[in-house]
Regions:
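Long helical/loop segments within the catalytic core of UDP-sugar-dependent glycosyltransferases
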Residues: 84, 88-96, 100, 104, ...
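Active-site acidic Asp-centered loop
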Residues: 62, 116-119, 144
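Short aromatic/hydrophobic "clamp" motif used to bind/position activated sugar donors
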Residues: 113
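Acidic donor-binding/catalytic loop of UDP-sugar-dependent glycosyltransferases
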Residues: 118-133
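Cell-envelope/extracellular polymer assembly enzymes that use nucleotide-activated donors
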Residues: 24-27, 56
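N-terminal membrane-anchoring/stem segments of glycan-assembly enzymes
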Residues: 1-20, 172
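Catalytic donor/gating beta->alpha subdomain of glycosyltransferases that bind UDP-sugars
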Residues: 140-142, 146-165, 194, 199-250
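Acidic donor-binding segment of Leloir-type glycosyltransferases
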Residues: 44-91
Length: 250
């Protein structure tokens, strides 16, 4: 146990050799699958307020509400970092998360991209800065996302379960045997993505943070960002029943 997990507390990504001499501009890609005003009003501002000089936020809206999309696009008047794109929702042709990410990647203006979800909340304004710094030492960057702290035993079990699940793949990553990340907090370059011909099985709603990552991760191209200032917390939408439904992604 100590041999496998004991390296996590002392791991420092800055021991790895640099491949860039400065932090790159970054595109933050966020797929949005509903008319989620709580994301727009509460969590999006935390992304836009990141303490980083050169970044954009690419929001891929999957839906059919033209008024909502116009409100979303209008935000660019106040926040020039925002780029929006829309995929028209058609019940006959379901749109997977990987399809939305594929559109977001093609819409991104920068080579280095960080991916998150509408449910994830940055814990500090240094999150993006630290994730971007990871690209100086690897073309793939993985970070941690916990579960928001709330009252109750169910929430305690959720937070503990997330920590244990994440410790398994983080331990392998710091040993230079990375095999996955978390869909709420990871990144890679366009060169990595298009060099691997993108996601496979675009119609499947799983695999972007594990199956794809297994194809492109090597011993030398992964940066692991473990600073508490670079963590996110996932918003919960229910109790243990909701949590068990989320475990299918692990």
């Amino acid at each position: 146990y100590i041999f496998v997990y004991g390296r996590i507390p002392g791991y420092k990504n800055n021991r790895r050799p640099q491949t860039m001499d400065r932090e790159p501009p970054v595109s933050v890609v966020v797929p949005l699958f509903s008319e989620d005003y709580s994301f727009v009003e509460e969590r999006l501002p935390l992304i836009l307020a990141q303490n980083y000089p050169d970044f954009e936020v690419v929001i891929v809206y999957v839906g059919h509400d033209s008024d909502f999309y116009e409100d979303l696009a209008r935000l660019k008047q106040s926040f020039t970092q925002i780029t929006t794109t829309k995929i028209q929702l058609d019940p006959r042709f379901p749109i997977s998360r990987k399809m939305a990410l594929n559109v977001g990647i093609k819409s991104a203006h920068y080579e280095c991209m960080v991916f998150t979800s509408t449910d994830a909340v940055p814990q500090t304004d240094r999150w993006l800065s630290l994730m971007a710094k990871g690209f100086m030492r690897g073309e793939i960057v993985v970070g941690y996302c916990g579960v928001e702290r709330r009252k109750g035993f169910a929430n305690y079990m959720m937070r503990t379960g997330r920590m244990m699940q994440s410790a398994a793949w983080i331990a392998r990553a710091v040993q230079r045997r990375a095999y996955r990340g978390t869909l709420h907090n990871y990144g890679f370059t366009k060169r990595i993505y298009f060099g691997a011909n993108g996601f496979s099985h675009l119609n499947m709603n799983i695999g972007e943070d594990d199956l794809f990552m297994q194809r492109v991760m090597t011993r030398d191209n992964v940066s692991v960002i473990l600073s508490p200032r670079a963590t996110l917390r996932e918003k919960t939408w229910g109790g243990m029943g909701w949590w068990m439904s989320q475990l299918r992604y692990y």
